[in-house]
Regions:
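Hydrophobic faces of well-ordered beta-strands that scaffold small-molecule active sites
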Residues: 1, 30-32, 60-64, 87-95, ...
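Metal-associated gating/positioning segment near the N- to mid-region
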Residues: 1-48
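Active-site mouth loops of central-metabolism enzymes
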Residues: 2-13, 63-72, 98-102
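Generic structural signal for hydrophobic
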Residues: 22, 53, 171-174
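Active-site-proximal loop/turn and secondary-structure-junction residues that shape catalytic pockets
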Residues: 36-38, 66-69, 95-97, 134-136, ...
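A glycine-rich helix N-cap at a beta->alpha junction
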Residues: 52-66
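Active-site gating/metal-coordination segments in enzymes
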Residues: 70-127, 180-182
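Active-site core of metal-dependent hydrolases
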Residues: 99, 113-184
Length: 184
């Protein structure tokens, strides 16, 4: 909702979405998040844009952090953002992508812990939305987490799971374990 891009220099930054663009395609609810750019784009701007969209009559929510590690938050932690910031419903991360921070399974578990505590304390549920690239590891760390900690799978939301055939097959397995899968 605050635009994206920037991977080819400042001139490649994508502008913010407009209200007329949202209405033209029938959108009633949006989820804003930062992607690769957790530096020139700010969570404060994302929050302000979500509030502005709400003020204009649509529903808007946001994820805290961006592709990278350590997580970036508005307050002191991912859990604090979920608990105390009305618009925050989860956290963003990237993995298996050359732009990702290559998070370990333990790092992912620590973020899930924050999302889970913040989610149930705030009554929002909480979600860890994970951008996937096409690197060979795919979602293997998420599959390991799902196998060893089945109660945590409901907090995981991997996306772009159709980049490769191998990733698609992992997604099918993840879905069979009870996980959400997204093929956008």
């Amino acid at each position: 909702i605050t635009g994206g891009g920037g991977q080819q220099g400042y001139a490649s930054l994508v502008p913010e979405v407009t209200m007329s663009e949202l209405v033209a395609c029938g959108t009633t609810t949006v989820l804003g998040m930062l992607g690769t750019d957790g530096f020139a784009k700010e969570l404060t701007t994302l929050y302000a844009k979500a509030k502005a969209i709400d003020d204009d009559g649509l529903s808007a929510y946001m994820l805290t952090s961006y592709y990278g590690l350590p997580t970036k938050t508005l307050m002191n932690s991912v859990a604090d953002d979920l608990i105390f910031i009305d618009k925050v419903i989860g956290c963003k991360l990237a993995m298996s992508d050359d732009r990702s921070p290559f998070p370990t399974e333990q790092e992912i578990l620590r973020i899930i812990h924050q999302v889970r505590l913040g989610g149930f304390t705030s009554g929002k549920g909480g979600i860890l939305h994970i951008h996937l690239g096409a690197l060979p590891e795919g979602i293997e760390p998420l599959l390991n987490i799902a196998r060893h900690y089945p109660t945590l799978i409901s907090y995981l939301s991997p996306t772009h799971l159709i980049r490769t055939e191998a990733l698609f097959m992992q997604a099918v397995e993840f879905g069979k374990l009870g996980g959400m899968i997204d093929f956008s």
